[in-house]
């Protein structure tokens, strides 16, 4: 039975629903009712719509203002970063230039030190050569003197007799007396 009631309701419903539709004839529609409804919508909806639009406008303006502030901050940070980068580049260039000049100075100092060491070694070598030359000359002189004395002694021994020996002694005694008298 219940199925039958549903069927009856359902068939009535479908007959009523079939009568709904869109009437496109403007003359048959109730323009006054529509005007009143639209007027009420505009009158009461104007405040709500105005508030919604104002809120949306304020939200958009705040978003734009925030975006502009973030853009300004980002631009400032970018400029600061560029300035720091430029300073870092300048400092790196200064360090590089100072390093190159320091390297040239060290190189020149090493060259000068090597030249001085070379000159000292040359002077030392020359002094050693002069010393060895003087020593060799002195040794030759001593040997020549020794040999000359040996020959002179041999010659004197071979030629010296007692008479010549006495004359030489007298001669040297006379020389010593002459020296003694000049001293006094």
UniProtKB/Swiss-Prot annotation:
Superkingdom, natural source: Eukaryota
GO annotations of cellular component type: chloroplast thylakoid membrane; proton-transporting ATP synthase complex
Keyword Transferase recorded: no
Residue intervals passing through the bilayer: 5-27
A GO molecular-function annotation: proton-transporting ATP synthase activity, rotational mechanism
Main location class: plastid
Keyword Ion transport: yes
Keywords, comma-separated and alphabetical: ATP synthesis, ATP-binding, CF(0), Chloroplast, Hydrogen ion transport, Ion transport, Membrane, Nucleotide-binding, Plastid, Thylakoid, Transmembrane, Transmembrane helix, Transport
InterPro entries per UniProt: ATP_synth_b/b'su_bac/chlpt
Pfam family name, one: ATP-synt_B
Annotated compartments: Plastid, Chloroplast thylakoid membrane
Membrane-protein topology: Single-pass membrane protein
Similarity comment: family membership: Belongs to the ATPase B chain family.
Additional detail: In plastids the F-type ATPase is also known as CF(1)CF(0).
Assembly behavior: F-type ATPases have 2 components, F(1) - the catalytic core - and F(0) - the membrane proton channel. F(1) has five subunits: alpha(3), beta(3), gamma(1), delta(1), epsilon(1). F(0) has four main subunits: a(1), b(1), b'(1) and c(10-14). The alpha and beta chains form an alternating ring which encloses part of the gamma chain. F(1) is attached to F(0) by a central stalk formed by the gamma and epsilon chains, while a peripheral stalk is formed by the delta, b and b' chains.
Known function: F(1)F(0) ATP synthase produces ATP from ADP in the presence of a proton or sodium gradient. F-type ATPases consist of two structural domains, F(1) containing the extramembraneous catalytic core and F(0) containing the membrane proton channel, linked together by a central stalk and a peripheral stalk. During catalysis, ATP synthesis in the catalytic domain of F(1) is coupled via a rotary mechanism of the central stalk subunits to proton translocation.
Protein name per UniProt: ATP synthase subunit b, chloroplastic
Organism name: Marchantia polymorpha
Gene that encodes the chain: atpF
